[in-house]
Amino acid sequence: MEHTEKSKGPAEKGLLGKIRRYLSKRPLPSPTDRKKFDHDFAISTSFHGIHNIAQNQNKVRKVIWLSVVLGSVSLLVWQIYSRLVNYFMWPTTTSIEVQYVEKIEFPAVTFCNLNRFQTEAVSRFGIIFFLWDIVSKVLRLQEISGNNTGSPEALDFVASHRNFSITEFVKNNGFYLNHDTLVHCEFFGKTCDPKDFKHVFTEYGNCFTFNYGENVQSKNKVSVSGRGLKLLLDVHQEEFTDNPVPGFADAGVIFVIHSPKKEPQFDGLGLSSPVGMHARVTIRQLKTIHQEYPWGECNPDIKLRNFTTYSTYGCLKECKAKHIQRLCGCLPFLLPGNGVECDLLKYYNCVSPILDHIERKGLCTMGTHNSSCPVPCEETEYPATIAYSTFPSQRATKFLAKKLNQSQEYIRENLVNIEINYSDLNYKITQQQKAVSVPELLADVGGQLGLFCGASLITIIEIIEYLFTSFYWVFIFFLLKILEMIQRTSPPQTV
């Protein structure tokens, strides 16, 4: 007898025994109590139709109400499923709004001479066209060049001019802006001069920007449509020249209209005005707002180090600069950032091949949300309409020839007249918007719950509470059964 009690002791004091004793103290409802619990829930829940099933004594009515409830639940599930599918397709709508204002900010205007270099300098360094094409390659959006850096003449020049600075050469021997080349400048009735323009390097060499930077944006506004910037430029054809082989055979001015917060981008986007022409440009301000992924393709988390305002063009320049600086140990002067400037030998041996490598491998891509440079979330553009007329007239030719002390032929072959005005004092906002927001989705789902089942969030909580309680009882019941089976099948312990 004593031996039997000692053998039972460890089993009762084991972990399973303790769990069983603890669970056995939790009272489980009897089958009658469980039926009463189910019935009370059915007649008290705010889920419409269930109490009609529970309270009706007529079997036919029970079946009818059961069919109604099941049908309503089926329709509810179908409607909610379709709403969720539609939401996760991330649909968008586009709204267009026109805002009228008393004053409107004037854009930046960057212009360049189509004849990029001084004739005298080109006569001494004829290779400059080829060299500049290699150097300015960093500004092009997409291009994979052939093996064009292997010209013997170019290689000889690079080898014999190790200290040659193409930056200083272009700055000193490219197009310049002074009172001779800027014959007349007027902005909204006020005279402007070369000091109001900022020098920038582009693929066209020396270029000049009016109204560039955030510090001047606030003061350069116009309050009357039809009045803006007027420029009369002298391109000095006899002093500046270009290589007609790659397509620089025109004479005149190329210009681009852009946001004061963004750098000029000429790659296929410039407007041009030939000599002997008056270009009348009317513009409108268009603001575009894109949604972030997954509704749109923009990424608001991307910030640029060298630009206050994000743009795809600025992002691509920083991306190229990062790869070139890492792989070549230098930085092209046309790209943003701080670093040792690349010399011509670096351009030949490293920068140009790396640019081809970047393009082939897709290291600097643009457009979609997962690209290196997705579309900006906000951008301002200036769609332009341009009209030309012959300039100057015969009488104006005589007047300008006398004023500038030049021949009439010189006036016709060198002067370019550009006028840029707003068509209206308004701007258009094109905004991409979420077709279905989270509050709208919740409201729609709530409406479906109310329409088909007369339910609400409180009803859902009631159902969750009912299911949790029922599951808890079933779980405790089966757990006790399992523990009892384990103790029965465990071998007896012997001393």
From Swiss-Prot:
Keywords on this record? Answer: Cell membrane, Disulfide bond, Glycoprotein, Ion channel, Ion transport, Membrane, Sodium, Sodium channel, Sodium transport, Transmembrane, Transmembrane helix, Transport
Tell me the outcome of changing residue 387 to S.
Answer: Loss of binding and inhibition by Ca(2+)
Note the topology in the membrane. Answer: Multi-pass membrane protein
Where does this polypeptide localize? Answer: Apical cell membrane; Cell membrane
What is the reaction catalyzed?
Answer: Na(+)(in) = Na(+)(out); Li(+)(in) = Li(+)(out); K(+)(in) = K(+)(out); H(+)(in) = H(+)(out)
* Stated family: Belongs to the amiloride-sensitive sodium channel (TC 1.A.6) family. ASIC5 subfamily.
What is this protein's record name? Bile acid-sensitive ion channel
What is the organism field in this record?
Rattus norvegicus (Rat)
